[in-house]
Structures are given as C-alpha cells and as structure tokens.
Amino acid sequence: MKLTCVMIVAVLFLTTWTFVTADDSRYGLKNLFPKARHEMKNPEASKLNKRDGCSSGGTFCGIHPGLCCSEFCFLWCITFID
C-alpha cells in the first residue's frame, strides 16, 4: 500500500514538473517565421553561420567534432595547414 502511494505521488510530481518546465508554444510559430524571413534576406544574420563556441587546433575536444572550428576531432582539435 505504501509503495503504491509513493508511486502515485512520484508520477504526479513528475507530470507536474513536465508541465511547469515546458516551453510556452502558443506563439512559437508566430515569432519563428519573421526571424527566418530576416535571415533569408540577410544570410550573414543567420546564427548557423557563426562559430562562437568553437575551439582552435590543439584543444581537447573528446569525441565531439562540433566543438572544433575545423570540424576534425580525434581527442584534440586538428587543424590542417595548406
């Protein structure tokens, strides 16, 4: 009986937590389209073209190539010189 009550309380808590922390998506598409249109007019305004958080050559990256500016990662960022 106690285990059942604990499980019910846990499920209610997790369900409430999910709804409280969820983003408000009522106006999500309304705000998304003007930004996308602005980026189409000015491609340099796109956030995808920016590499602010990338690491230079010789920096430890683990196995995540997205962390390196050169996109080549084998434990350390690899930069090729032409």
Curated annotation (Swiss-Prot):
Q: What is its main location?
A: secreted
- Residues spanning the signal sequence: 1-22
Keyword Transmembrane in the entry? The reply is: no
Entry's Gene Ontology cellular component terms: extracellular region; host cell presynaptic membrane
Per UniProt, subcellular location reads as: Secreted
Q: What cystine linkages occur within this chain? A: C54-C69, C61-C73, C68-C77
Question: Domain remarks in the entry?
Answer: The presence of a 'disulfide through disulfide knot' structurally defines this protein as a knottin. The cysteine framework is VI/VII (C-C-CC-C-C).
UniProt-recorded name of the protein: Delta-conotoxin SVIE
Q: Which organism is it from?
A: Conus striatus
